[in-house]
Amino acid sequence: MTDDRLTDPVAEQVLDGNALAGMLAATFGTEMTTVPGQCAHCGTVSMIGELRAYVRAPGAVLRCPTCDGIILRVVETTEATYVDARGAVHLRFVRR
């Protein structure tokens, strides 16, 4: 068995969702890494911090750790922040 990071040049660029903690907190106004969400592709429930983060594109993409489906896209421009969450059935924000 080989280590995927040695054979896949993209694998070394993958972070976990915690890498986007600051961007997501600024966008949503709350700590997001512990927010659970359900993948629309496979039904897995994961916290945002557990998702696979790809940050080298113009923006950030968060993917399901189980099926690799795209759950969330975030793009920041000088004028606005765009969030595409169509890959999530839901995100669960607990009231405090």
Where are these regions (language model features)?
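Short Cys/His-rich Zn2+-coordinating modules
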Residues: 15-29, 44-50
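Short cysteine-rich clusters marking metal-coordination/redox-active sites
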Residues: 39-42, 64-67
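Short, charged, intrinsically disordered terminal tails
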Residues: 4-9, 78, 85-96
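Short Cys/His-rich "knuckle" micro-motifs
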Residues: 46-53, 74-77
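Short metal-binding segments enriched for Cys and/or His
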Residues: 66-82, 93-94
